[in-house]
A protein has these predicted regions:
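Entry/capping segment at the start of metal-dependent catalytic domains
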Residues: 6-21, 26-123, 244, 335-336
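C-terminal solvent-exposed extensions
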Residues: 84, 89-94, 105, 109, ...
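Second-shell loop/turn segments in exported
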Residues: 86, 160-172, 186-192, 246-256, ...
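Extracytoplasmic/secreted envelope proteins and their assembly/folding machinery
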Residues: 93-96, 175-183, 198-202, 206, ...
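Flexible, solvent-exposed short loops/turns enriched in glycine
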Residues: 110-161, 217-232
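Amphipathic, coiled-coil-like alpha-helical scaffolding segments used for oligomerization/assembly
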Residues: 145-227, 326-331
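Flexible, polar/acidic helix-loop-strand segments at domain edges
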Residues: 200-304, 409, 414-419, 423-426
Length: 426
């Protein structure tokens, strides 16, 4: 397949990793506000464009810097970061994945990422593993005068070399750091992120009437005993099965629990697909938000995502103008309906290739870069992204890694098999 230079728009967060690659256009996006408008009006150059003829036409974004799908193919494909956070502040994430929605083909591909995946904090992060980022974002160095994050090459000690103003340290953005890992270490754009607290996942499953899974053996979940076989698990039991049951906080046990997570996610997908929009979200006669997702989004454990006009537009493949006044519950419910229209046999799951390795005395999950490149090109690259040894830079601790399992499954094969009663049986 021929590759088009304009297919990935690079924002400031990914610029450092790609600044010498002229086949992709690096863009610096600075937070939208009055200052940006003034700078644009006065014609100050804010963007370092390498290839002006083939770059996509981009409008000002209402968001922090990161890499998203280029506008010219955004109607065909979108990439999302999915995750579930741990139970307590400071805990590693329970679940993490990248999802590619090929709108044109009507299919979805999900690559599950072990939470112990090694990222190396020397690459500009505060921690060594991706699952620890959520509660440990890298502090940001900010120039209040220019109203911009300042990269290392623009700092002169504690002063912004560009304007001479003093720099200040601010709390970083966890979601931005997560996205930056995917941008800079795996060469993928991210159009939005969807991060749900563990308690929120339990509430969602409960509201949908539970999820049906097949248990391989007798287990105790949420204080209740279940025999081997097919059972409907309600919120707390389903979440325990998906994230903590038999999990030993090791890379090996993380891969094992990913198979259980697929079971729960397949059943959850099936339940949401059976819902109508009015089941998920509506306003009552008093204007109060109701519905399954309406209740979740207005409760104590809502789904977190980029709620700007651009973020909502990228979820739904609509214009920013159409997304501007859309309520968050409405946007998420519309997104859920869209995803529910993708048949389960068109939803493919795989695991990021790698193996357990030692980083000092700590066991982490180290990728097999060659296999990562092969998997991402096969599963997530129908529109000519550059996914190669130059863009997939994730640290690999073992330079002679073992071959990982590259098998994929579709969600329809994960659901329990229920026998149809023979004719005449009740």
């Amino acid at each position: 397949m021929s590759k088009n230079k304009g297919q990935v728009s690079l924002a400031g967060a990914a610029q450092a990793a790609n600044e010498e690659k002229k086949r992709i256009s690096p863009w610096k996006w600075i937070g939208v506000g009055v200052g940006l408008v003034a700078l644009l009006v006065t014609g100050i150059l804010l963007f370092d464009v390498v290839d002006t003829e083939e770059k996509p036409a981009l409008t000002a974004r209402e968001m922090a810097e990161y890499t998203y799908t280029a506008d010219d193919i955004a109607g065909d494909v979108a990439y999302y970061l999915l995750g579930v956070t741990g139970e307590n502040i400071g805990d590693p994430m329970d679940m993490l994945a990248v999802m590619c929605h090929d709108r044109k083909a009507g299919s979805v591909s999900v690559v599950q990422i072990p939470v112990a995946t090694y990222i190396d904090k020397n690459n500009g992060f505060a921690v060594d593993t991706i699952g620890d980022i959520w509660y440990n974002p890298q502090p940001e160095i900010f120039c209040s005068a220019c109203r911009v994050r300042v990269p290392a090459e623009e700092r002169d000690g504690k002063v912004h070399a560009t304007c001479g103003a003093d720099l200040e340290e601010r709390t970083g953005s966890a979601w931005l750091d997560l996205v930056r890992v995917i941008n800079t270490q795996y060469g993928l754009p991210i159009d939005n992120y969807l991060i749900l607290p563990r308690a929120g996942l339990a509430e969602l499953i409960e509201a949908l009437g539970g999820v049906e899974v097949e248990l391989a053996k007798k287990v105790t979940l949420a204080g209740e005993s279940y025999s081997a076989g097919v059972h409907t698990l309600m919120g707390d039991a389903a979440v325990e099965y998906a994230v903590t049951y038999n999990y030993k906080n090791t890379p090996a046990s993380d891969r094992e629990r990913m198979s259980r997570q697929r079971q729960v996610l397949a059943a959850l997908w099936q339940k949401i697909a059976a819902c109508k929009m009015e089941d998920l979200y509506y306003l009552d006669q008093y204007g109060a938000t109701k519905g399954i997702l309406g209740k979740l989004m207005t409760g104590a454990n809502p789904l977190r995502f980029n709620t700007t006009s651009f973020g909502k537009a990228r979820l739904l493949n609509i214009s920013e103008e159409a997304a501007a006044d859309m309520k968050l519950s409405d946007a998420i419910s519309r997104f859920a309906v869209q995803m529910g229209q993708v048949p389960l046999d068109r939803v493919t799951f795989s695991i990021l290739p790698g193996a357990a390795e030692k980083n000092g005395t700590v066991s982490v999950y180290s990728v097999n870069r060659e296999q990562v490149i092969a998997l991402l090109n096969e599963q997530m690259n129908a529109y000519g992204l550059y996914i190669d040894e130059d863009t997939v830079t994730a640290p690999q601790l073992n330079q002679d890694p073992k071959e990982a399992d590259l098998s994929t499954v579709t969600l329809d094969t994960v659901l329990p098999v229920t026998e149809e009663p023979e004719e005449g049986e009740e």
